[in-house]
């Protein structure tokens, strides 16, 4: 019996997922372009370095390194097969690109775009940068401030009240509490203000959303009004209904800065401070002295929160701050222009990318898998400024409830992306042999079944793949089933080809001239082995 060798687990995934293909085509033959263009036959190539002299069929839009293990190649072909025509995929191992499918095709990236915002913010501002929200004006004399105090917004995206954090159950996030600013004013000796509490949001423009966003983004509260002085995400909580256990609803405010001043006024009154003139909008006087201030958590923690929770408001406000630092103003347009500049500095072809906003909500955004993979690698890899702050499969953020019980759990860290007709995933996987795979996957287009099945398959494939198989390598195979648990099924000594419908079984001709039987993560050219699908796969929602 010959020694075991790695196999494409993708094929068995195709079986259980019920994916069918015309008998004349292979899974890899899905063609890019306008939906409905269909598929085309790809040329047959014979590459001894790739397949040991076997004949492989390759998509002309897909390139593979000759020395890449055919198991991984076939598995990644399976990922493409599970995806709509408008899909890009790139996989690097050890900084060498091993698989590219339409990797230079510009597609809607959804929230994976946030990796660019995080990278630029950390590069331009530094991980230790803190946003500062100040109250300026005349100091108190015998507890009395004669005149106005001005609340100056510093762009803190996580400024909140303790009540809002409690109701929204976000207290575990790196929040900045407005309550602390009220405490600081009391500690500074303020007991009465004879004037007004003025709100200054002049650091950024007052465009409350991205003009090209659909109206439903605001009506569905996907993002609150944007501004340099925003508290509680720009929402006001409805009064709590006595006896109700449900959290109160929230309403979007029209003037976020004025709302912030109103909230501070409530907090001051609760501490015995009176403000004779109420609240108003305005700009702080030039040279006004600081009376009290509150600082955010370090930017590194803010970026982590943005990436883990896919926080749209944080991404948009960071984009405006990037514009301020660039010297071109606190607007979305200036921020996105600076992001493009940073991308060019990193060697990313800027003609392949379009930034209409910072969060990835806009359907006018365009990124390539090449661009995403490049920024992930050039920002320091899995332990770099972005990689170290990504959600981890089965543990944190938008991936906390995904890939549970699979080889990807704890090994995959990535940014998710989801819009109607868009699903994306980009990040890193620590493979079982210790090597790191960097990957980017974007799929655009409606899918009849679970839209995440392609990226789920990708994560599990990379999580359990070994670049070198040994005689004692035999791990349970895990197949993504679009969020449904898999019952344990024993398939005793059955050639893989016998399990497939004829159209899919034709793909096996690319593997060997003799039947192969799957055993864990490897195969042996022998009889008598069994296959156990004993591990369930669970997928979960994530932006």
Task: Go through the PLM ranges and name each one.
Residues 95, 109-127, 197, 229, ...:
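Active-site SXXK
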Residues 17-56, 130, 272:
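C-terminal region of N-terminal signal peptides and the immediate post-cleavage residues
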Residues 100, 319, 323-483:
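Small-residue-rich helix-loop
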Residues 234-384:
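A small/polar active-site loop signature that marks catalytic segments
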Residues 38-106, 180-189, 193:
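Beta-lactamase-like hydrolase cores
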Residues 86-88, 144-227, 234, 273, ...:
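Mid-domain, small-residue-enriched loop/turn segments at the edges of structured enzyme/sensor domains
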Residues 123-138, 146, 276-280, 383-387:
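Short, well-structured active-site flanking segments
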Residues 457-536:
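Short, gly/Ser/Thr-rich active-site loops of penicillin-recognizing serine hydrolases
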């Amino acid at each position: 019996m010959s020694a075991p060798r790695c196999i494409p687990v993708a094929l068995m995934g195709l079986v259980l997922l019920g994916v069918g293909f015309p008998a004349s085509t292979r899974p890899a033959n899905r063609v890019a372009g306008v939906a409905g263009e269909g598929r085309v036959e790809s040329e047959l190539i014979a590459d001894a370095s790739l397949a040991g002299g076997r004949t492989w069929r390759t998509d002309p839009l897909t390139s593979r390194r000759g020395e890449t293990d055919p198991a991984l190649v076939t598995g990644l072909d399976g990922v493409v097969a599970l995806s709509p025509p408008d899909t890009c995929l790139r996989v690097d191992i050890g900084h060498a690109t091993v698989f590219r499918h339409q990797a230079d095709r510009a597609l809607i990236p959804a929230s994976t775009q946030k990796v660019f915002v995080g990278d630029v913010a950390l590069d331009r501002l530094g991980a230790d940068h803190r946003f500062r929200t100040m109250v300026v004006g005349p100091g108190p004399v015998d507890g009395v401030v004669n005149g106005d105090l001005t609340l100056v917004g510093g762009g803190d995206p996580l400024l909140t009240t303790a009540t809002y954090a409690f109701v929204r159950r976000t207290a575990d996030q790196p929040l900045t509490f407005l309550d602390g600013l009220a405490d600081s004013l009391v500690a500074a000796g303020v007991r009465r203000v004879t004037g007004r509490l003025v709100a200054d949001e002049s650091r950024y423009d007052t465009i409350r959303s991205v003009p090209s966003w659909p109206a439903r983004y605001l009506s569905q509260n996907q993002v609150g009004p944007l501004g340099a002085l925003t508290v509680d995400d720009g929402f006001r909580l409805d009064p709590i209904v006595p006896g109700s256990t449900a959290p109160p609803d929230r309403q979007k405010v029209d003037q976020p800065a004025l709302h912030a001043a109103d909230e501070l006024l409530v907090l001051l009154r609760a501490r015995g401070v009176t403000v004779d003139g109420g609240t108003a909008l305005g700009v702080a006087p030039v040279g006004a002295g600081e009376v009290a201030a509150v600082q955010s958590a370090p930017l590194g923690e803010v970026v982590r929160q943005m990436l883990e929770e896919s926080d749209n408001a944080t991404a948009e406000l960071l984009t405006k701050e990037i514009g301020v630092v660039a010297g071109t103003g606190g607007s979305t347009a200036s921020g996105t222009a600076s992001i493009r500049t940073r991308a060019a500095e990193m060697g990313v072809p800027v003609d392949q990318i379009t930034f209409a906003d910072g969060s990835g909500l806009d359907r006018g955004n365009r990124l390539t898998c090449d661009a995403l993979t490049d920024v992930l690698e050039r920002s320091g890899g899995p332990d770099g400024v972005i990689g170290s702050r990504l959600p981890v499969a089965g543990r944190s953020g938008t991936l906390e409830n995904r890939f549970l019980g699979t080889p990807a759990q704890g090994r995959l860290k990535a940014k998710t992306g989801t819009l109607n007709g868009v699903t994306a995933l980009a990040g890193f996987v620590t493979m079982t042999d210790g090597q790191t795979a960097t990957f980017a996957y974007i799929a655009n287009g409606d899918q009849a079944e679970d839209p995440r099945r392609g990226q789920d398959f990708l994560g599990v494939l990379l999580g359990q793949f070994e670049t070198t198989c040994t005689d004692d390598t035999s791990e349970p195979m895990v197949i993504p089933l679009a969020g449904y648990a898999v019952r344990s099924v024993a398939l005793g000594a059955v050639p893989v080809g016998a399990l497939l419908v004829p159209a899919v079984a034709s793909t096996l001709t690319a593997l060997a001239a003799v039947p192969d039987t799957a055993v864990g993560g490897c195969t042996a050219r022998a009889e008598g082995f069994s296959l156990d699908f004993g591990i369930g796969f669970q997928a979960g929602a994530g932006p």
